[in-house]
Amino acid sequence: MSELIMNEKTDLEPQVPSVLPLLALRDVVVYPHMQIALFVGREKSINAVDVARNSDNLVFVVAQKDSLTEEIDHDNLYQYGTVAKIVQVVNHENDENCIKVLIEGLHRSKLKKIIDEDSYLTAEHELSPMTINVDKATQETRLQELRNLFAQYAEAKLRNARELVAAANKIEDLLQLMFFVATRVPLNIEIKQKFLEYDEFEAHLQELMNYLMNQSAEQQIEQTLHDSVKRQMEKNQREYFLNEKMKVIQRELSDMNGGAEDDVAEIEKRLAEADLPEHVRKKAEAEFRKLKAMQPASSEAAVVRNYLEVILDTPWNKASKVSINLNKAQEILDADHYGLDDVKDRIVEYLAVQSRVKKLKGPILCLVGPPGVGKTSLGESVAKATGREFVRMALGGVRDEAEIRGHRRTYIGAMPGKIVQSLTKVGVKNPLFLLDEIDKMAQDYRGDPASALLEVLDPSQNSKFNDHYLDLDLDLSEVMFICTANSMNIPEALLDRMEVIRLPGYTEDEKVNIAERYLVPKAIKNNGLRPKELTIHEEAIRDIVQRYTREAGVRNLEREVSKIARKVVKEAVSKKSKNLQLDVTSANLPEYLGPHKFDFGMAEDEAQVGRVNGLAWTSVGGELLTIEVAAVKGKGKFITTGSLGDVMKESITTAMTVVRTRADELGIEASRFEETDVHVHLPEGATPKDGPSAGLALTTALVSAFTGIAIRPDIAMTGETSLGGRAMRIGGLKEKLLAAHRGGIKLVFIPQDNVRDLAEIPDNVKEGLEIKAVKSIDEILPLALTSMPKPLPKTPIVKPVEGSKAARH
């Protein structure tokens, strides 16, 4: 056979030109003795076919390495290809720019060079026939082995196995049979190309036979698995048939409960009428089929029946109409709450966007503020303003994740979580959800409810919220969530999903306004009084705020107002008076509420040495903070009293250093610091005090104590100080300035960096105070002290020695 090929090469080589038109193929390898139909669409390839047809119908075909590349170059073509003969050319039925070419492979050939003829490509090649280095008997053996292996493979993998096996049995040439088989197995382009490139015939044949043997082994394993699965399916079908037969017998023999039948019929009717998403309906119908096959009195039937009722009660597609009337919404918010402008603006902004964008994911607002400032009631007002149903979910003390996500149905007494329960209660899928006290959640061995809320509060994830009980995706993207908290003690991942709006607490003027507009009319109505029977004057309300309550919100203020109303009702009932008309003023207020509960911070009338007014921020607002410093003869000891925190103690140390660095300018001899004991005291010792914002006030008080110069009583100051005496920015400026205004202060010193915060200060406060922004303590002392100390005379550091001579170097 090898001699035949060699003779064939000798005879044909002069007949095959060394340069032929080139056809580059995608994902196809053409072997000798192989016929294949090709769809040719590239312009140069079509031109190459035309050139070949006009000469000897011979072309050089070779596979591309990268089939996605449009341009043809030598680097993207394999080294070996095939000289092929064009048998037939037909135009494509549906594409004018494509032709169908039937070719027959003739000889293996090696690509040497590509020549660009402008309109088509040619290939310079060299014929490279394969050699068979085995004797005749071995060839016959290999021929039969390859036929047998291909027959096994074809019967297992190929559709037209009988025709292909018959065709293979007719082939007597081993080389031709090898190429015939290689074209019928699903090998990738790299492996098929390797078959063409093998110089040794035996290696080519062995690779192909190994592949066929591996495929036969895989087929045997697959057949074994198929038989095993078939036997198991027959067993399962038999068990299913027997179980169904048993259920039918049980239904016939059991005493059927009419009420249970009615329940099933009712569920079937509701299921047919319900508006359910496709995935929910499929699940519900599957569960209903199970229910009909069960005995109605069984516990399993009760579980399935409850599950179906929850599905049918859940508002999957029912939504309430959301109001987008901005003016009406603003009126409702203003009528229900005084102040809280940031929150109102955010709600109105959301409604404005919703009026333009029909589909908008609900915002996640988190209102953080002290108790009693109206966080929860604000949620109700927002629901009313937007036309949404209102749902309040208290999270205080919740420790179990199942409270949020529900229990799985496998547990006895399982039920859905509070999210699904609340939606079922209101009957719509777009309510306003108020998650109250979100900072009060805890965790234990039952799970972490805060982590369960991560999915609920993420707008990009809550469209597919999965409750453990339902085990179905529920869309929460149209729910508007508002969370409330007293502090920022919220898990970081949860906090990141929310837009935090801080409610710092009401100012004194805001509390008075709220009492006049809301609390007093409410107390009169709730206690059965008529408006003309009780009048509480503004100065009395202000007195209640200052001397009977100390809070950031208005709850205690409401209690005190209600207390007055109850006493008035008692007086009216006891006297049986029909024309009762009482005025509550600042003068007669103690008759109703008793003596004052709190001292109202007021500035001193006289200037004192070592005593200065600081300004403090507390959870219930701002206060005047008196700072007292006494300097007495001693040994340089430093004493602090008044329940001071570590930060304030460090601030005192810093202030002392600031004074010592300015000792000469302030007229303080250096020895004074070693011979004087300093005592810093902040009155109301039972109240803990901390923070760095008293630095400027402490420095001023220390200067006054060491110099003996008094400090003006009508000034106050706030600000942290650096070692160089620079005034540094502080927080809570609004509350502090309100306290200064309330306490009769005339001049307030604030750091220069806090000027930007003055925009938040009410105009009546700014008009009643002289606010001076300073950069350092040096700007405060001339205005705060009643007089400036005289600096010490400057003395040279080194005194000259009489008669000394200049040093020589």
Curated annotation (Swiss-Prot):
Subcellular compartments: Cytoplasm
Main enzyme class: hydrolase
A GO cellular component entry from the record: cytoplasm
Active-site residues per Swiss-Prot or TrEMBL entry: 693, 736
Cross-referenced PROSITE patterns: LON_N, LON_PROTEOLYTIC, LON_SER
Induction: By heat shock.
Record's catalysed reaction(s): Hydrolysis of proteins in presence of ATP
EC number(s) on file: 3.4.21.53
InterPro entries referenced in this protein's UniProt entry, alphabetically: AAA+_ATPase, ATPase_AAA_core, Lon_bac, Lon_bac/euk-typ, Lon_lid, Lon_proteolytic, Lon_Prtase, Lon_prtase_N
Alphabetical list of Pfam families matching this protein: AAA, Lon_C, Lon_lid, LON_substr_bdg
Protein name (Swiss-Prot/TrEMBL): Lon protease
Originating species: Acinetobacter baumannii (strain AB307-0294)
The organism's taxonomic lineage, starting at the top: Bacteria, Pseudomonadati, Pseudomonadota, Gammaproteobacteria, Moraxellales
Gene name of this polypeptide: lon
